[in-house]
Amino acid sequence: MKEQLLTYCKQLRLSAMFADNAMDATGETNQEYMLEVLKAEVTYRSIKRRNLNLKKAGFDSIKTFQCYDFEDITIPPDLTIDLLKQAEFLSRQENLILYGRNGAGKSHMATAIGVEACMQGKKVMFYKTAALVNELVAAKAEGSLLKLLKKLSKLELLICDEWGYIPFDAEGSQLLFQVIADCYEKRSLIITTNIEFSKWNGIFYDNQLTTALIDRLVHHSHLIIFGRDSWRFKHSLMNHSDK
């Protein structure tokens, strides 16, 4: 009987675990038995999907919010720590911009949110921003850019870590802008950076492109500021908004 179950599971694209559960499950009625078997299959698939999402996300290491220190971190009034931990902003395709000095915990927070999103069954990718640009440039040279952009378009969260650490040439800037523009109001972004908006012209090749990129990032975004640079960064943002 076990072999027959495995055969039917394969034909119906059910997991081999379904056959094991079917052999072990009990129930006073047929309906209770079937409910137990199906519930076990749903649980198995959910765990498998979470693990696959974590594997594909490309995190440097798995981080969580356990023992994370929120002291000296400025969170905007429309967010709470609990909502942040739950990655609640993803439901509205909103963005996070994490700004502060090196070593302040920006990458840790971005990763922890990404891990939580994976645990919720969402598709996430984590990139060092320079690595993403290099991958885009290489894909264009190899004729596979559309394939990469299609892959990115299926995400629910794209994390760009170390934004602005390395300046980009014209091609890299334009390709990164294309990715950000494609995300606009469709999927969420998390950006980690230690560079003020007023200095982003030094990162990207073109001032006009820089302005357009900032506009798309800031709209529907929450600013989370690490350390004591809160006023300076907010002032930089206000100056940009007035232009």
Q: Can you describe what each PLM-predicted range is?
A:
Residues 91-96:
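Pre-Walker A (Motif I) flank of P-loop NTPase domains
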Residues 98-100:
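Hydrophobic anchor at the beta1->P-loop junction of P-loop NTPases
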Residues 106:
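Conserved lysine of the Walker
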